[in-house]
Amino acid sequence: MSAEPLLPTHNGSQGGEVRSPDQKFIVIRFSDVSVRDLQLNISNVPFSNINTHWLRRMCRELRPQQTQKRRLKFIRNGSILNTHSKIAEELTHYFDTANNSNVATGTSVAPEQNNYYIHCIIGTEELTQAELANEDLKDDATPSNDSMTTQAIGFDRLRSVGFTEQEIELLRQQFRATYGDLEEEEERLAQNGNRDDEGHDIRQLEEQWMESGSGTAQGNGAGGGNEDRFNSVPIANIKHNKDLLLGICVGFFFGVFGILLMKFDGLFNRRQKMAIFAGVIVNVMFCLVRGF
């Protein structure tokens, strides 16, 4: 974990310190994958003080280089957050549900269960001081999720609440990067001439993510185990690693013949082809080293 203070008044876990099971965190996951996740220790922070204004202040204090003067929009499981969002109630419900579930099963609290994930979209335009001062009002001026157009599905719905094309594309890239098999399925169906159907299927997955937050604050908590299934999946999907390993091995052991295999449609996906090319380069380098 980063050695920087998670809050101005509280120092988070340092170096090899063991994280206490009682500690609670808000994890800000940015749409720009080059910006690492921001963990905010809220163990000693009253939930009533946590709102979008507080989240923006924390982001700009702890990630100033990437967020200063940028428009910041927050999403929780597809729900756009504003000053009217009941973040305090959701935090209480989330952590109470996790705690009650562990008490019922007699298990200890896993570190991941104490993480409450919020997505942050970093805007591309720079805001003036006046616009920064009225940023919360801009959130309130956007339509609610219930008033979004029903014709568009998935992340395309965000256009109706003021998101730019670039911001939507950043969010979509992060979503697809998390699930590497989506890219593979896209290529497979595109080769079969079913690209339009596949695009609709992926939009449906995006729609499921957009709507997944609507029922998590209700009921008896039976769905608590799946509440963060989209958020807690690591960005580096294991399927990516398998494709890279397969491609590098094919390129290294088959050499130039591996490039010929790339000509067969449907045999390798795009990620595997890139890895094959890298494997061929490694093969050539070994040949040069042995030659000398």
From Swiss-Prot:
Membrane topology: Multi-pass membrane protein
Ranges annotated as spanning the membrane: 244-264, 274-291
UniProt xrefs under InterPro entries: Dsc3, Dsc3_C, Dsc3_ub-like_dom
Cytoplasmic side: 265-273
Extracellular compartment spans: 1-243, 292
Record's keyword terms, sorted: Endocytosis, Endoplasmic reticulum, Glycoprotein, Membrane, Protein transport, Transmembrane, Transmembrane helix, Transport
A Gene Ontology BP annotation from the UniProt entry: endocytosis
Keyword Iron-sulfur: no
Top-level taxon: Eukaryota
Compartment list: Endoplasmic reticulum membrane
Record-annotated disulphide pairs: none
Entry GO CC: Dsc E3 ubiquitin ligase complex; endoplasmic reticulum; endoplasmic reticulum membrane; fungal-type vacuole lumen; Golgi membrane
Glycosylation sites: 11, 41, 77, 99, 145
Described purpose of this protein according to its UniProt entry: Component of the DSC E3 ubiquitin ligase complexes that tag proteins present in Golgi, endosome and vacuole membranes and function in protein homeostasis under non-stress conditions and support a role in protein quality control. Involved in endocytic protein trafficking.
Description of how the protein assembles with itself and partners: Component of the DSC E3 ligase complexes composed of at least TUL1, DSC2, DSC3, UBX3, CDC48 as well as VLD1 for the vacuole-localized complex or GLD1 for the Golgi/endosome-localized complex.
Protein family according to the UniProt entry: Belongs to the dsc3 family.
Protein name per its UniProtKB record: DSC E3 ubiquitin ligase complex subunit 3
